[in-house]
Protein backbone atom coordinates (compact mmCIF):
# COMPACT_ATOMS: atom_id res chain seq x y z
CA UNK A 1 0.00 0.00 0.00
CA UNK A 2 2.81 2.37 0.89
CA UNK A 3 4.57 1.52 -2.35
CA UNK A 4 1.50 2.36 -4.43
CA UNK A 5 1.13 5.75 -2.75
CA UNK A 6 4.77 6.60 -3.41
CA UNK A 7 4.39 5.60 -7.05
CA UNK A 8 1.34 7.84 -7.54
CA UNK A 9 3.11 10.78 -5.92
CA UNK A 10 6.03 10.42 -8.30
CA UNK A 11 3.70 10.34 -11.29
CA UNK A 12 1.94 13.47 -10.08
CA UNK A 13 5.19 15.38 -9.62
CA UNK A 14 6.35 14.39 -13.08
CA UNK A 15 3.11 15.52 -14.63
CA UNK A 16 3.25 18.92 -12.87
CA UNK A 17 6.87 19.46 -13.94
CA UNK A 18 6.01 18.54 -17.50
CA UNK A 19 3.15 21.08 -17.69
CA UNK A 20 5.33 23.87 -16.35
CA UNK A 21 8.04 23.20 -18.87
CA UNK A 22 5.47 23.12 -21.69
CA UNK A 23 4.25 26.55 -20.73
CA UNK A 24 7.75 27.97 -20.94
CA UNK A 25 9.03 25.86 -23.90
CA UNK A 26 6.06 24.45 -25.79
CA UNK A 27 7.87 23.48 -29.02
CA UNK A 28 10.52 21.40 -27.29
CA UNK A 29 8.02 19.10 -25.56
CA UNK A 30 5.47 18.33 -28.22
CA UNK A 31 6.35 14.62 -28.58
CA UNK A 32 6.57 13.78 -24.89
CA UNK A 33 3.14 15.37 -24.40
CA UNK A 34 1.55 12.52 -26.34
CA UNK A 35 3.36 9.82 -24.33
CA UNK A 36 2.31 11.48 -21.10
CA UNK A 37 -1.29 11.41 -22.06
CA UNK A 38 -1.15 7.71 -22.99
CA UNK A 39 0.26 6.55 -19.61
CA UNK A 40 -2.18 4.48 -17.58
CA UNK A 41 -2.79 5.54 -14.02
CA UNK A 42 -4.18 3.05 -11.60
CA UNK A 43 -5.14 5.60 -8.96
CA UNK A 44 -7.90 7.00 -11.21
CA UNK A 45 -6.36 10.52 -11.25
CA UNK A 46 -7.59 12.29 -14.44
CA UNK A 47 -5.39 15.35 -14.12
CA UNK A 48 -3.42 14.45 -17.25
CA UNK A 49 -6.58 14.05 -19.29
CA UNK A 50 -7.79 17.50 -18.19
CA UNK A 51 -4.58 19.04 -19.41
CA UNK A 52 -5.15 18.12 -23.07
CA UNK A 53 -7.79 20.69 -23.93
CA UNK A 54 -5.90 23.37 -21.93
CA UNK A 55 -2.82 22.72 -24.01
CA UNK A 56 -4.86 23.22 -27.23
CA UNK A 57 -6.19 26.56 -26.06
CA UNK A 58 -2.72 27.76 -25.17
CA UNK A 59 -1.50 26.82 -28.63
CA UNK A 60 -4.25 28.87 -30.25
CA UNK A 61 -3.50 31.82 -27.99
CA UNK A 62 0.20 31.61 -28.77
CA UNK A 63 -0.48 31.50 -32.49
CA UNK A 64 -2.75 34.57 -32.30
CA UNK A 65 -0.19 36.34 -30.22
CA UNK A 66 2.53 35.63 -32.78
CA UNK A 67 0.33 36.86 -35.63
CA UNK A 68 -0.55 40.03 -33.70
CA UNK A 69 3.09 40.75 -32.96
CA UNK A 70 4.01 40.15 -36.59
CA UNK A 71 1.30 42.60 -37.71
CA UNK A 72 2.51 45.18 -35.19
CA UNK A 73 6.03 44.88 -36.55
CA UNK A 74 4.71 45.60 -40.05
CA UNK A 75 3.09 48.94 -38.87
CA UNK A 76 5.53 51.83 -39.57
CA UNK A 77 5.12 53.39 -36.07
CA UNK A 78 7.38 53.32 -33.04
CA UNK A 79 6.23 51.29 -30.03
CA UNK A 80 5.61 54.34 -27.84
CA UNK A 81 3.19 55.76 -30.44
CA UNK A 82 1.23 52.54 -30.49
CA UNK A 83 1.07 52.55 -26.70
CA UNK A 84 -0.20 56.15 -26.69
CA UNK A 85 -2.89 55.30 -29.25
CA UNK A 86 -3.98 52.37 -27.15
CA UNK A 87 -4.20 54.51 -24.01
CA UNK A 88 -6.24 57.22 -25.79
CA UNK A 89 -8.57 54.62 -27.24
CA UNK A 90 -9.07 53.13 -23.81
CA UNK A 91 -9.85 56.52 -22.30
CA UNK A 92 -12.39 57.24 -25.06
CA UNK A 93 -14.09 53.93 -24.45
CA UNK A 94 -14.13 54.60 -20.73
CA UNK A 95 -15.72 58.05 -21.12
CA UNK A 96 -18.35 56.66 -23.49
CA UNK A 97 -19.22 53.99 -20.97
CA UNK A 98 -19.53 56.60 -18.20
CA UNK A 99 -21.85 58.78 -20.32
CA UNK A 100 -24.06 55.83 -21.13
CA UNK A 101 -24.25 54.91 -17.44
CA UNK A 102 -25.24 58.47 -16.45
CA UNK A 103 -28.00 58.60 -19.05
CA UNK A 104 -29.38 55.32 -17.87
CA UNK A 105 -29.37 56.53 -14.25
CA UNK A 106 -31.14 59.79 -15.17
CA UNK A 107 -33.83 57.93 -17.08
CA UNK A 108 -34.40 55.66 -14.12
CA UNK A 109 -34.79 58.67 -11.77
CA UNK A 110 -37.26 60.38 -14.13
CA UNK A 111 -39.29 57.24 -14.43
CA UNK A 112 -39.42 56.95 -10.64
CA UNK A 113 -40.59 60.58 -10.30
CA UNK A 114 -43.26 60.17 -12.96
CA UNK A 115 -44.45 57.03 -11.28
CA UNK A 116 -44.63 58.88 -7.96
CA UNK A 117 -46.62 61.73 -9.51
CA UNK A 118 -48.89 59.28 -11.21
CA UNK A 119 -49.59 57.64 -7.88
CA UNK A 120 -50.34 60.99 -6.25
CA UNK A 121 -52.66 61.99 -9.09
CA UNK A 122 -54.38 58.66 -8.82
CA UNK A 123 -54.90 59.27 -5.12
CA UNK A 124 -56.25 62.78 -5.75
CA UNK A 125 -58.58 61.54 -8.45
CA UNK A 126 -59.82 58.85 -6.11
CA UNK A 127 -60.45 61.46 -3.45
CA UNK A 128 -62.32 63.62 -5.96
CA UNK A 129 -64.39 60.70 -7.14
CA UNK A 130 -65.10 59.73 -3.58
CA UNK A 131 -66.31 63.23 -2.69
CA UNK A 132 -68.59 63.37 -5.71
CA UNK A 133 -68.71 65.56 -8.84
CA UNK A 134 -71.68 67.59 -7.66
CA UNK A 135 -69.76 68.73 -4.62
CA UNK A 136 -66.93 70.01 -6.87
CA UNK A 137 -69.41 72.01 -8.92
CA UNK A 138 -70.85 73.48 -5.77
CA UNK A 139 -67.38 74.40 -4.54
CA UNK A 140 -66.58 76.09 -7.84
CA UNK A 141 -69.78 78.09 -7.70
CA UNK A 142 -69.17 79.14 -4.13
CA UNK A 143 -65.62 80.14 -5.06
CA UNK A 144 -66.94 82.45 -7.75
CA UNK A 145 -69.44 84.05 -5.43
CA UNK A 146 -67.12 84.56 -2.44
CA UNK A 147 -65.98 87.96 -3.74
CA UNK A 148 -69.57 89.04 -4.32
CA UNK A 149 -70.57 87.92 -0.85
CA UNK A 150 -67.72 89.93 0.67
CA UNK A 151 -68.78 93.02 -1.26
CA UNK A 152 -72.36 92.59 -0.12
CA UNK A 153 -71.22 92.17 3.47
CA UNK A 154 -69.09 95.31 3.19
CA UNK A 155 -72.08 97.21 1.88
CA UNK A 156 -74.21 95.93 4.73
CA UNK A 157 -71.58 96.91 7.28
CA UNK A 158 -71.33 100.43 5.82
CA UNK A 159 -74.21 102.09 7.65
CA UNK A 160 -75.25 105.50 6.36
CA UNK A 161 -77.82 106.25 9.03
CA UNK A 162 -81.59 106.63 8.82
CA UNK A 163 -84.21 109.34 8.37
CA UNK A 164 -87.71 109.84 9.79
CA UNK A 165 -90.30 111.50 7.55
CA UNK A 166 -94.06 111.90 7.18
CA UNK A 167 -96.45 112.02 4.21
CA UNK A 168 -99.93 113.54 4.12
CA UNK A 169 -102.06 114.14 1.03
CA UNK A 170 -104.91 116.68 0.94
CA UNK A 171 -107.45 115.49 -1.64
CA UNK A 172 -109.37 118.78 -1.60
CA UNK A 173 -106.32 120.99 -2.17
CA UNK A 174 -104.52 118.39 -4.38
CA UNK A 175 -101.28 118.80 -2.50
CA UNK A 176 -98.76 116.46 -0.89
CA UNK A 177 -97.12 117.55 2.36
CA UNK A 178 -93.70 116.01 3.06
CA UNK A 179 -92.41 116.35 6.60
CA UNK A 180 -88.68 115.91 7.33
CA UNK A 181 -88.65 115.14 11.05
CA UNK A 182 -85.14 113.99 11.93
CA UNK A 183 -82.16 111.80 11.04
CA UNK A 184 -80.02 109.54 13.19
CA UNK A 185 -76.72 107.64 13.22
CA UNK A 186 -75.25 109.59 10.32
CA UNK A 187 -71.59 108.98 9.42
CA UNK A 188 -69.00 111.60 10.36
CA UNK A 189 -67.64 113.34 7.26
CA UNK A 190 -65.89 116.31 8.88
CA UNK A 191 -62.47 116.37 10.55
CA UNK A 192 -63.97 116.87 14.00
CA UNK A 193 -65.91 113.60 13.84
CA UNK A 194 -69.25 115.24 13.04
CA UNK A 195 -71.23 116.44 10.01
CA UNK A 196 -73.31 119.46 8.99
CA UNK A 197 -76.35 117.70 7.51
CA UNK A 198 -79.30 119.06 5.59
CA UNK A 199 -81.95 117.37 3.41
CA UNK A 200 -82.99 117.95 -0.20
CA UNK A 201 -86.50 116.87 -1.19
CA UNK A 202 -87.50 116.09 -4.81
CA UNK A 203 -90.66 114.75 -6.40
CA UNK A 204 -89.22 112.94 -9.41
CA UNK A 205 -89.08 112.95 -12.36
CA UNK A 206 -89.32 116.74 -11.95
CA UNK A 207 -85.98 117.88 -10.51
CA UNK A 208 -86.87 121.45 -11.22
CA UNK A 209 -88.97 121.66 -8.09
CA UNK A 210 -86.90 120.98 -4.96
CA UNK A 211 -86.83 121.95 -1.30
CA UNK A 212 -84.00 122.08 1.22
CA UNK A 213 -84.03 122.02 5.00
CA UNK A 214 -81.83 124.22 7.14
CA UNK A 215 -78.30 123.06 7.89
CA UNK A 216 -77.85 121.50 11.33
CA UNK A 217 -74.28 122.22 12.45
CA UNK A 218 -71.93 119.63 13.94
CA UNK A 219 -74.32 116.77 14.64
CA UNK A 220 -74.88 113.18 13.60
CA UNK A 221 -78.47 113.08 14.90
CA UNK A 222 -80.08 116.24 13.50
CA UNK A 223 -83.66 117.33 14.18
CA UNK A 224 -85.35 119.28 11.35
CA UNK A 225 -89.15 119.34 11.85
CA UNK A 226 -89.72 121.06 8.50
CA UNK A 227 -92.57 120.53 6.03
CA UNK A 228 -92.76 121.07 2.27
CA UNK A 229 -95.78 121.12 -0.03
CA UNK A 230 -95.99 119.77 -3.59
CA UNK A 231 -99.11 120.69 -5.56
CA UNK A 232 -99.86 117.57 -7.58
CA UNK A 233 -103.26 116.27 -8.77
CA UNK A 234 -104.08 112.84 -7.39
CA UNK A 235 -104.28 111.38 -10.93
CA UNK A 236 -100.65 112.38 -11.61
CA UNK A 237 -99.28 111.32 -8.23
CA UNK A 238 -99.05 107.65 -9.20
CA UNK A 239 -96.19 108.29 -11.61
CA UNK A 240 -94.10 110.24 -9.08
CA UNK A 241 -91.22 109.16 -6.85
CA UNK A 242 -90.35 111.02 -3.68
CA UNK A 243 -86.61 111.33 -3.05
CA UNK A 244 -85.05 112.63 0.16
CA UNK A 245 -81.26 113.06 0.01
CA UNK A 246 -79.14 113.90 3.06
CA UNK A 247 -76.09 116.10 2.33
CA UNK A 248 -73.14 117.26 4.38
CA UNK A 249 -72.70 121.02 4.01
CA UNK A 250 -69.19 122.26 3.27
CA UNK A 251 -68.44 125.94 2.90
CA UNK A 252 -65.27 125.50 0.86
CA UNK A 253 -66.02 122.52 -1.39
CA UNK A 254 -68.80 120.56 -3.00
CA UNK A 255 -71.43 119.18 -0.64
CA UNK A 256 -71.15 115.42 -0.12
CA UNK A 257 -74.24 113.23 -0.39
CA UNK A 258 -74.44 111.03 2.71
CA UNK A 259 -77.34 108.91 1.50
CA UNK A 260 -80.85 108.99 0.14
CA UNK A 261 -84.31 107.43 0.43
CA UNK A 262 -86.74 106.94 -2.46
CA UNK A 263 -90.47 106.32 -2.02
CA UNK A 264 -92.65 105.12 -4.89
CA UNK A 265 -95.96 106.94 -4.54
CA UNK A 266 -97.84 104.01 -6.10
CA UNK A 267 -96.98 101.93 -3.01
CA UNK A 268 -98.14 104.53 -0.48
CA UNK A 269 -101.63 104.49 1.04
CA UNK A 270 -102.57 108.15 0.86
CA UNK A 271 -105.86 107.57 2.66
CA UNK A 272 -104.09 108.11 5.98
CA UNK A 273 -101.06 110.00 7.22
CA UNK A 274 -97.79 108.08 7.04
CA UNK A 275 -94.85 108.46 9.41
CA UNK A 276 -91.88 106.07 9.43
CA UNK A 277 -88.12 105.53 9.64
CA UNK A 278 -86.09 104.35 6.67
CA UNK A 279 -82.43 103.48 6.27
CA UNK A 280 -80.39 105.68 3.98
CA UNK A 281 -79.01 104.08 0.83
CA UNK A 282 -75.87 105.10 -1.01
CA UNK A 283 -76.54 107.55 -3.80
CA UNK A 284 -75.49 106.48 -7.28
CA UNK A 285 -72.76 108.64 -8.71
CA UNK A 286 -74.05 110.44 -11.76
CA UNK A 287 -72.01 112.09 -14.45
CA UNK A 288 -72.10 115.88 -14.23
CA UNK A 289 -75.04 117.20 -16.18
CA UNK A 290 -74.23 119.38 -19.17
CA UNK A 291 -75.82 122.76 -18.61
CA UNK A 292 -74.57 124.60 -21.69
CA UNK A 293 -71.99 127.26 -22.55
CA UNK A 294 -71.96 131.04 -22.51
CA UNK A 295 -69.75 133.54 -24.34
CA UNK A 296 -68.90 136.80 -22.57
CA UNK A 297 -66.61 139.73 -23.29
CA UNK A 298 -64.70 141.71 -20.65
CA UNK A 299 -63.14 145.16 -21.06
CA UNK A 300 -61.54 147.34 -18.39
CA UNK A 301 -60.29 150.92 -18.68
CA UNK A 302 -57.99 151.65 -15.70
CA UNK A 303 -57.91 155.45 -16.13
CA UNK A 304 -61.70 155.74 -16.15
CA UNK A 305 -62.22 152.87 -13.67
CA UNK A 306 -64.85 151.34 -15.96
CA UNK A 307 -65.58 147.61 -16.37
CA UNK A 308 -67.73 146.59 -19.34
CA UNK A 309 -69.34 143.12 -19.41
CA UNK A 310 -70.91 142.05 -22.70
CA UNK A 311 -73.18 138.99 -22.84
CA UNK A 312 -72.77 137.80 -26.41
CA UNK A 313 -74.57 134.44 -26.70
CA UNK A 314 -75.19 131.00 -25.18
CA UNK A 315 -75.52 127.53 -26.68
CA UNK A 316 -76.67 124.00 -25.83
CA UNK A 317 -78.57 125.14 -22.75
CA UNK A 318 -80.36 122.61 -20.58
CA UNK A 319 -84.02 121.95 -21.44
CA UNK A 320 -86.15 123.37 -18.66
CA UNK A 321 -89.68 123.55 -20.12
CA UNK A 322 -92.09 120.72 -20.86
CA UNK A 323 -91.80 121.33 -24.60
CA UNK A 324 -88.05 120.66 -24.55
CA UNK A 325 -87.00 124.30 -24.76
CA UNK A 326 -86.28 127.19 -22.38
CA UNK A 327 -86.86 130.93 -22.06
CA UNK A 328 -83.34 131.98 -21.04
CA UNK A 329 -82.09 135.31 -19.78
CA UNK A 330 -78.87 136.33 -17.99
CA UNK A 331 -78.24 138.05 -14.66
CA UNK A 332 -74.94 139.80 -13.89
CA UNK A 333 -73.96 140.49 -10.28
CA UNK A 334 -71.02 142.57 -9.10
CA UNK A 335 -69.73 141.04 -5.85
CA UNK A 336 -67.21 142.02 -3.20
CA UNK A 337 -66.42 139.81 -0.18
CA UNK A 338 -69.52 137.72 -0.88
CA UNK A 339 -71.83 140.77 -0.95
CA UNK A 340 -73.87 141.77 -3.99
CA UNK A 341 -73.05 145.37 -4.92
CA UNK A 342 -74.90 145.78 -8.23
CA UNK A 343 -77.18 143.73 -10.47
CA UNK A 344 -77.97 143.78 -14.22
CA UNK A 345 -79.96 141.46 -16.50
CA UNK A 346 -80.55 140.85 -20.20
CA UNK A 347 -83.78 140.47 -22.11
CA UNK A 348 -85.61 137.11 -22.21
CA UNK A 349 -85.21 135.00 -25.36
CA UNK A 350 -88.29 132.81 -25.90
CA UNK A 351 -88.28 129.11 -26.79
CA UNK A 352 -84.61 128.60 -27.52
CA UNK A 353 -81.60 126.74 -26.22
CA UNK A 354 -79.13 128.84 -28.22
CA UNK A 355 -79.97 132.49 -27.46
CA UNK A 356 -78.10 135.46 -28.94
CA UNK A 357 -77.97 138.65 -26.82
CA UNK A 358 -75.01 140.97 -27.59
CA UNK A 359 -75.94 143.18 -24.65
CA UNK A 360 -73.38 145.25 -22.70
CA UNK A 361 -73.37 146.43 -19.08
CA UNK A 362 -70.94 148.82 -17.36
CA UNK A 363 -69.76 149.03 -13.75
CA UNK A 364 -67.71 151.78 -12.10
CA UNK A 365 -64.76 150.17 -10.33
CA UNK A 366 -61.62 152.10 -9.29
CA UNK A 367 -58.31 150.54 -10.27
CA UNK A 368 -57.31 149.88 -6.65
CA UNK A 369 -60.54 147.86 -6.18
CA UNK A 370 -60.49 145.79 -9.38
CA UNK A 371 -58.66 142.87 -7.73
CA UNK A 372 -61.21 142.71 -4.90
CA UNK A 373 -64.38 142.21 -6.96
CA UNK A 374 -65.98 139.32 -8.82
CA UNK A 375 -68.47 139.28 -11.67
CA UNK A 376 -71.07 136.51 -11.41
CA UNK A 377 -73.01 135.52 -14.55
CA UNK A 378 -76.16 133.38 -14.12
CA UNK A 379 -78.34 131.94 -16.89
CA UNK A 380 -81.96 131.48 -15.78
CA UNK A 381 -85.14 130.07 -17.30
CA UNK A 382 -87.95 132.60 -17.18
CA UNK A 383 -91.29 131.32 -15.81
CA UNK A 384 -94.40 133.48 -15.70
CA UNK A 385 -96.08 131.53 -12.92
CA UNK A 386 -93.42 130.02 -10.71
CA UNK A 387 -89.88 130.83 -9.69
CA UNK A 388 -87.26 131.44 -12.34
CA UNK A 389 -84.88 128.49 -12.14
CA UNK A 390 -81.14 128.82 -12.63
CA UNK A 391 -79.76 126.79 -15.53
CA UNK A 392 -76.11 127.40 -14.75
CA UNK A 393 -73.60 129.88 -13.44
CA UNK A 394 -69.99 131.12 -13.73
CA UNK A 395 -67.91 133.85 -12.11
CA UNK A 396 -64.72 135.69 -13.06
CA UNK A 397 -62.30 137.45 -10.76
CA UNK A 398 -58.93 137.19 -9.07
CA UNK A 399 -60.09 134.26 -6.91
CA UNK A 400 -61.59 132.31 -9.83
CA UNK A 401 -59.96 129.25 -11.41
CA UNK A 402 -59.50 127.63 -14.80
CA UNK A 403 -60.74 129.44 -17.88
CA UNK A 404 -62.52 132.06 -15.74
CA UNK A 405 -59.28 133.15 -14.05
CA UNK A 406 -57.45 133.16 -17.39
CA UNK A 407 -60.16 135.37 -18.89
CA UNK A 408 -59.88 137.85 -16.02
CA UNK A 409 -56.06 137.90 -16.25
CA UNK A 410 -56.16 138.48 -20.01
CA UNK A 411 -58.52 141.43 -19.48
CA UNK A 412 -56.17 143.06 -16.96
CA UNK A 413 -53.15 142.40 -19.19
CA UNK A 414 -54.86 144.07 -22.17
CA UNK A 415 -56.47 147.29 -20.90
CA UNK A 416 -59.07 149.03 -23.12
CA UNK A 417 -59.39 145.92 -25.28
CA UNK A 418 -62.49 143.67 -25.17
CA UNK A 419 -61.52 140.03 -24.47
CA UNK A 420 -64.15 137.43 -25.42
CA UNK A 421 -64.19 133.81 -24.25
CA UNK A 422 -66.52 130.81 -23.94
CA UNK A 423 -67.23 129.29 -20.51
CA UNK A 424 -69.01 126.09 -19.50
CA UNK A 425 -71.89 126.66 -17.10
CA UNK A 426 -71.63 125.08 -13.65
CA UNK A 427 -74.30 124.17 -11.08
CA UNK A 428 -75.49 127.14 -9.05
CA UNK A 429 -74.62 125.53 -5.72
CA UNK A 430 -71.04 124.81 -6.75
CA UNK A 431 -70.43 128.44 -7.74
CA UNK A 432 -72.11 129.77 -4.61
CA UNK A 433 -69.81 127.64 -2.46
CA UNK A 434 -66.75 128.94 -4.31
CA UNK A 435 -67.94 132.52 -3.80
CA UNK A 436 -68.73 131.95 -0.13
CA UNK A 437 -72.36 132.94 -0.59
CA UNK A 438 -74.88 131.94 2.07
CA UNK A 439 -77.42 129.22 1.38
UniProtKB/Swiss-Prot annotation:
Q: How is the cofactor bound?
A: Binds 3 Ca(2+) ions per subunit. The ions are bound to the C2 domains.
Recorded GO terms, molecular function?
calcium ion binding; calcium-dependent phospholipid binding; clathrin binding; phosphatidylserine binding; SNARE binding
Q: What's the cofactor?
A: Ca(2+)
Is Phosphoprotein a UniProt keyword of this protein?
A: no
- Region annotated Phospholipid binding sits at 153-399
List, as start-end ranges, the regions of compositional bias called Basic and acidic residues.
119-129
Q: Which residues bind Ca(2+) 4?
A: 321, 327, 381, 383
The superkingdom listed in its UniProt entry is Eukaryota
* Annotated segments matching region Disordered: 113-155
| Chain segments annotated as transmembrane | 75-101
Kindly report every residue range on the membrane side named Cytoplasmic: 102-439
Instruction: Spell out the Acidic residues composition-biased ranges.
Output: 135-151
- Give the primary localization class: membrane
The record's Gene3D superfamilies line, in alphabetical order, gives: C2 domain
Checking PROSITE patterns in the record gives: C2
UniProt-annotated location(s): Cytoplasmic vesicle, Secretory vesicle, Synaptic vesicle membrane; Synapse
GO biological process terms on file: calcium ion-regulated exocytosis of neurotransmitter; synaptic vesicle endocytosis
Residues binding Ca(2+) 3, per UniProt: 250, 253-254, 256
| UniProt tissue specificity | Spinal cord, brainstem, midbrain and electric organ.
Q: How does it assemble?
A: Homodimer or homotrimer (possible).
Give the family, as the similarity comment puts it: Belongs to the synaptotagmin family.
What functional role does this protein have?
May have a regulatory role in the membrane interactions during trafficking of synaptic vesicles at the active zone of the synapse. It binds acidic phospholipids with a specificity that requires the presence of both an acidic head group and a diacyl backbone.
Name-wise, this protein is Synaptotagmin-B
What lineage does UniProt assign to this protein's organism? Eukaryota, Metazoa, Chordata, Craniata, Vertebrata
Annotated gene: P65-B
Amino acid sequence: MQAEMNQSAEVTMKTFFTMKTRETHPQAFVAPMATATMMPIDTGDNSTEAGVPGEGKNDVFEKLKEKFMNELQKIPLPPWALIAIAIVSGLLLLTCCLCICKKCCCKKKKNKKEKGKGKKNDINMKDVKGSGGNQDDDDAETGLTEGEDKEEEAKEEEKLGKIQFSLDYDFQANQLTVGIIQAAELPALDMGGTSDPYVKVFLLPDKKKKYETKVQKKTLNPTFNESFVFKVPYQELGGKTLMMAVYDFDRFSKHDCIGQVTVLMTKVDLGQQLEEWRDLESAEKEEPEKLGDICTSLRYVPTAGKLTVCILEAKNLKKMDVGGLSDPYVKIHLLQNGKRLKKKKTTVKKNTLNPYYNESFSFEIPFEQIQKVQVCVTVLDYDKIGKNDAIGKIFVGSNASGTELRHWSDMLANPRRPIAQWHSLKPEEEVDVALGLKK
